[in-house]
Every structure is written in C-alpha cells, then in structure tokens.
C-alpha cells in the first residue's frame, strides 16, 4: 500500500481500454455495474491506436494505390499508371480520420455508459486492491470485481535494439517514408 493513502472503493475495474476492455466495461455497465477503466496510454488501447486498426488502414491505402496502378489494365485495357502516393497525407488520414474517429467514438461510448476512466498503470496490492501509478501520483482502488484486458508490448531481440533502422510495430506505423525493403520478425 501507499503510505498514508486510503483506497477509494469501486465496484468493477477493467484494466485496459482496448477492444476487450472497453467492450467488457460497457457490457458490465449495461448490466448495472459501476465501472472504472484503468488505462496506461490512450483510450482504445494498442489495437485502436498503434496496432490492428492503423495497420489495416495502411494496408487498405496500399491496396488502393496498387489498384490504381495495376488492376484496371488487365480488366478493360484502361491505362492508369500515373497514381502517386503522398505518404504524409496517408499518415494524416490514418491518424486523424481513422484512429481519432474510432478512439473518439469509444470515449463517447464510455461517457454515455457513465464509465469512469483513471489514467495510469495498475499494480495489484492484493486480490481486492490495485495501486494506480501515473507520472505524477499514485492512488489505491479497492474493487469487488476485476477484468484484466491488457494489450501487448513488443519485445526487443538481443542485439537488435529499437533504434535507427530497427523499429517495433509502433515505429513501423509512423515511418517518415515508405521503405524500399522491409523485414518483419514475428507478427
């Protein structure tokens, strides 16, 4: 326990606000529970912010680019080889139109269901108390029910630190330019 701190009592906590966490939190709220989400980073978790969704957005943009340059040629004889890719505009679309729209929608749903959000990293003190640690403070939450819906983190392979030409999945989604070659390890 944090010395001198008294735990705030809550009914149900959900650790993580990604697709597993926010859906569980909303369902628990619909069933009448008072729910508190504990989130270390951005609402929507890894998947909506720096994982599945932005990856699929970039893949979709790549398919659109390829289609503009190749698909029509073989079907109707239409020549359309002049398409170009504005990578900065693609990144802006991914971040503003896809990620921000979806995470904003999740935040609105959480607010609609009166779900409290506590920012920080949860660490269990015992089977009914978590210590929520943020950059500038920590506080205790005593709970009746807990759902753990944490995301993932990339791990560094010894000898391949994330710097320079070696990037993790988050770095790959925000590269300043489209690489000519790319090796993916894991997945």
Regions found by a protein language model. Name each.
Residues 2-9, 26-33, 38-178:
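Glycine-rich flavin
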Residues 4-18, 180-185:
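Beta1/beta-strand and adjacent pyrophosphate-binding region of the FAD-binding site
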Residues 21-22:
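N-terminal Rossmann-fold NAD(P) dinucleotide-binding loop
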Residues 94, 186-187:
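NAD(P)H cofactor-binding loop motif with strongest signal on the N-terminal glycine-rich segment
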